[in-house]
Amino acid sequence: MSTVTITDLARENVRNLTPYQSARRLGGNGDVWLNANEYPTAVEFQLTQQTLNRYPECQPKAVIENYAQYAGVKPEQVLVSRGADEGIELLIRAFCEPGKDAILYCPPTYGMYSVSAETIGVECRTVPTLDNWQLDLQGISDKLDGVKVVYVCSPNNPTGQLINPQDFRTLLELTRGKAIVVADEAYIEFCPQASLTGWLAEYPHLAILRTLSKAFALAGLRCGFTLANEEVINLLMKVIAPYPLSTPVADIAAQALSPQGIVAMRERVTQIIAEREYLIAALKEIPCVEQVFDSETNYILARFKASSTVFKSLWDQGIILRDQNKQPSLSGCLRITVGTREESQRVIDALRAEQV
């Protein structure tokens, strides 16, 4: 009699999965953490809700109302979740039939779209971006049959550039009545003029992902948002967990989205953008740096001579960057989060000393 192992009992698609390599999972013993696009210093909050004996609201009223006001949408168009990552998964669970439907995304881009789909047993289709990292609209059009959700990250992680708005419009027309288009705006606070929130009335199949992890400096809170028309939000409410946000998370999120919280966030954005420009200018003068790409975000993508050697050398000095070599069209590329001036200087000095 053959022995069935625990692994044999698992779903076949789960047995074949590779866990997503988050920045934290990759580890390292650094003291300069520039690999996860976090804000470099902690922001202090005091808890005001002392009701931990009670279950929280599924969609905390203060959080929803504050975010709706900030984003310029109606409260009925907002869903709050455990980070934007949960929003990615909820959209697949609500709209994709496992073993039948597909999602589509355009690498090089954020890795969680594929992880979420594969976990659920939904097919992933990819249409690599063009040489300038803009959408290959013809390629997308050719692969749309059977696709229910299309993910587009703008500004794109890890390349840092915005997707051409006219291309977004073309994509939304191509998918009308066929698929949900998800604009991942995790980094939109660094270029707010490019947000698609004003398009929701025009496109009922548009959904927008947002987060408090970047400009709001709350990556450890795990709080994100999906903005969409009420019909989409109502469907997502059918598949979301009953208590996605703990009471302390909702408490801090509401404070971060208060008028004072928004002002503080905008000050952080101004400071990070100034630091980004300083770091870009310095990187362009360093011999081992072959190319520095423009960025609309809180990180910089650059191509290096002997990038693996450079990555390991900085790692050994406690400076942890994000290696993008395995992504399509990103050979030799490392991604550097914009940190404090001291952290920028550590990176600059270490790179200047590289003999490659």
Swiss-Prot record:
It catalyses: L-histidinol phosphate + 2-oxoglutarate = 3-(imidazol-4-yl)-2-oxopropyl phosphate + L-glutamate. The keyword Lipoprotein does not apply. Its cofactor is pyridoxal 5'-phosphate. Its EC number is 2.6.1.9. SUPFAM superfamilies: PLP-dependent transferases. Pathway: Amino-acid biosynthesis; L-histidine biosynthesis; L-histidine from 5-phospho-alpha-D-ribose 1-diphosphate: step 7/9. The modification N6-(pyridoxal phosphate)lysine is found at residue 214. It comes from the Bacteria. GO terms for molecular function: histidinol-phosphate transaminase activity; pyridoxal phosphate binding. The keyword Glycosyltransferase does not apply. GO terms for biological process: L-histidine biosynthetic process. Keywords: Amino-acid biosynthesis, Aminotransferase, Histidine biosynthesis, Pyridoxal phosphate, Transferase. Homodimer. Belongs to the class-II pyridoxal-phosphate-dependent aminotransferase family. Histidinol-phosphate aminotransferase subfamily. NCBIfam families: hisC (TIGR01141). This is Histidinol-phosphate aminotransferase. It comes from Escherichia coli O139:H28 (strain E24377A / ETEC). The lineage of its organism: Bacteria, Pseudomonadati, Pseudomonadota, Gammaproteobacteria, Enterobacterales.
